[in-house]
């Protein structure tokens, strides 16, 4: 049946004649004539017209990808190679001799922009999240992080339990692992314009973490061995350690969870001392009496200066955290979620420690919750600035700033805090258990960021 239909239609197709063409029969010269007609006049090209052709082909920019062996030549260099001056006119024959030069520059991709340059100069590249996704996911993550400031009141009854100290030690080690790894795997490479799917830097970043972990492991093992060797000798810790920690305030509270040890008032005034005693006594009151006390509150004049210093510094810290989150979400939802996870792991022990300090400085529990949450809300302000800066300017500088901040917090702030929290276990003969908890937290944080970076191409968010 199809053959019969085809044989019936064949005579009509032959009668219709050949398919109309747009002009002359197609030949090799047709392509050359088409170029000369579209870019030139009278089947010839002037130098500005030839320059326009090179710009459309992205050839002749001079100074392209330095990784390629072939050099990206400027248009003036290409013209000089063919003895062309500013007043020259290229006819069909001259353009045929010029074509191999264009073909060589295109084939070697010498003038192709590097991924880092494209990432920095094309902020509206395809694949970036929409403004609704950026603001929506950003506010969601910041809200979850800010709620960590309210968890402090829930753990107050457990602060004298042994499990609290071990949980706090694990959380601090987890924060170090996630912050350090997030800076190595995502923030710093993003600042340089690297892509984990194209640039093989993940293994190199893992080696950097390996060097850090190797020295940490060696130092801890050597200390445990030397302590066992000299356990009957002199003590390495002075007798006034607790007094020194009382003056410093922060590490003592995180280590012992002891709200009975108060920070001395700044001027020794009776009102400050009375306010501090009330802050401690409220922890030992029965449930109903404590509730009535919360409703009274404490006069702001009775609150120590340390509380206001902690609130202001924590607000600035949270602002920079929000800045990093906002800039990350402008790049991709995945990048923003990864940065938020690292900050969340750091915020839980940090906000818990701040809550204890505010109580010891003379605040009531409602006041400590309010000001701790108020400083946490500064993260929203940083988020807005980060989104606006990342949407209209290059976010590489924000990633560089956040990467340096994460490294400082992890190594200079959280790491000594982890050592202070584990000091009691080390002095009490439980150094090995504390060492294992530290290892579990560090390696867990590292593994989370490594897996997120390695499988970033398979994880679809937004």
From Swiss-Prot:
Keywords in alphabetical order: Cell membrane, Endosome, Glycoprotein, Ion transport, Lysosome, Membrane, Signal, Transmembrane, Transmembrane helix, Transport, Zinc, Zinc transport
Residue spans crossing the bilayer: 139-159, 168-188, 202-222, 323-343, 368-388, 397-417, 432-452
Protein name: Metal cation symporter ZIP14
Membrane topology: Multi-pass membrane protein
Composition-biased stretches (Basic and acidic residues): 241-251, 269-279
GO BP: any one term: cellular response to glucose stimulus
Stretch forming the signal peptide: 1-16
Cytoplasmic topological domain residue ranges: 160-167, 223-322, 389-396, 453-462
Molecular function terms, GO-annotated: cadmium ion transmembrane transporter activity; iron ion transmembrane transporter activity; manganese ion transmembrane transporter activity; monoatomic anion:monoatomic cation symporter activity; zinc ion transmembrane transporter activity
Family: Belongs to the ZIP transporter (TC 2.A.5) family.
Sequence motif HHHGHXHX-motif, residues: 230-237
Topological domains annotated Extracellular: 17-138, 189-201, 344-367, 418-431
Upper taxonomic lineage: Eukaryota, Metazoa, Chordata, Craniata, Vertebrata
Major localisation: membrane
One Gene Ontology cellular component: early endosome membrane
Reaction it catalyzes: Zn(2+)(out) + 2 hydrogencarbonate(out) = Zn(2+)(in) + 2 hydrogencarbonate(in); Mn(2+)(out) + 2 hydrogencarbonate(out) = Mn(2+)(in) + 2 hydrogencarbonate(in); Fe(2+)(out) + 2 hydrogencarbonate(out) = Fe(2+)(in) + 2 hydrogencarbonate(in); Cd(2+)(out) + 2 hydrogencarbonate(out) = Cd(2+)(in) + 2 hydrogencarbonate(in)
Subunit structure: Homotrimer.
Organism of derivation: Xenopus tropicalis (Western clawed frog)
């Amino acid at each position: 049946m199809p053959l019969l239909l085809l044989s019936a239609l064949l005579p009509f197709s032959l009668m219709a004649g050949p398919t109309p063409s747009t002009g002359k029969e197609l030949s090799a010269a047709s392509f050359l004539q088409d170029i000369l007609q579209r870019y030139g006049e009278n089947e010839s090209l002037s130098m500005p017209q030839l320059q326009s052709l090179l710009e459309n082909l992205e050839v002749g920019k001079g100074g392209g990808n330095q990784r390629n062996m072939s050099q990206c030549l400027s248009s003036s260099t290409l013209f000089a190679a063919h003895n062309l001056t500013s007043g020259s006119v290229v006819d069909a024959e001259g353009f045929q001799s010029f074509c191999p030069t264009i073909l060589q520059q295109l084939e070697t991709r010498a003038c192709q922009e590097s991924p880092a340059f494209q990432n920095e100069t094309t902020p509206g590249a395809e694949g970036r999240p929409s403004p609704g996704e950026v603001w929506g996911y950003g506010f969601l993550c910041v809200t979850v992080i800010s709620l960590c400031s309210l968890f402090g009141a829930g753990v107050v009854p457990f602060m004298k339990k042994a499990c609290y100290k071990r949980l706090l030690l694990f959380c601090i080690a987890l924060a170090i692992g996630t912050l350090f790894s997030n800076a190595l795997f995502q923030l710093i490479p993003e600042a340089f314009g690297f892509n984990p799917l194209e640039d093989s830097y993940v293994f190199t970043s893992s080696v950097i973490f390996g060097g850090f972990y190797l020295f940490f492991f060696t130092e801890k093992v050597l200390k445990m061995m030397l302590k066992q060797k000299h356990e009957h000798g002199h003590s390495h810790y002075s007798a006034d350690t607790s007094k020194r920690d009382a003056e410093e305030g922060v590490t003592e509270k995180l280590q012992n969870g002891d709200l009975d040890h108060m920070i001395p008032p700044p001027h020794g005034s009776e009102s400050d001392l009375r306010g501090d005693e009330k802050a401690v006594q409220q922890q030992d009151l029965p449930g109903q009496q404590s509730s009535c006390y919360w409703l009274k509150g404490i006069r702001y004049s009775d609150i120590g200066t340390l509380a206001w210093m902690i609130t202001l510094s924590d607000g600035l810290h949270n602002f920079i955290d929000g800045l990093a989150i906002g800039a990350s979400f402008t790049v991709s939802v995945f990048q923003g979620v990864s940065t938020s996870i690292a900050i969340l792991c750091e915020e839980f022990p940090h906000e818990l420690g701040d809550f204890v300090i505010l109580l010891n400085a003379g605040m009531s529990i409602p006041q400590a919750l309010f000001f701790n949450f108020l400083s946490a809300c500064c993260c929203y302000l940083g988020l807005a600035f980060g989104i606006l800066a990342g949407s209209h300017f290059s976010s590489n500088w924000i990633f560089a700033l956040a990467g340096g901040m994460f490294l400082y917090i992890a190594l200079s702030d959280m790491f000594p805090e982890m050592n202070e929290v584990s000091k009691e276990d080390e002095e009490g003969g439980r150094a090995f258990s504390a060492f294992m908890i530290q290892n579990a937290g560090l390696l867990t944080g590292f593994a989370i960021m490594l897996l997120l970076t390695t499988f970033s191409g398979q994880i679809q968010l937004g």
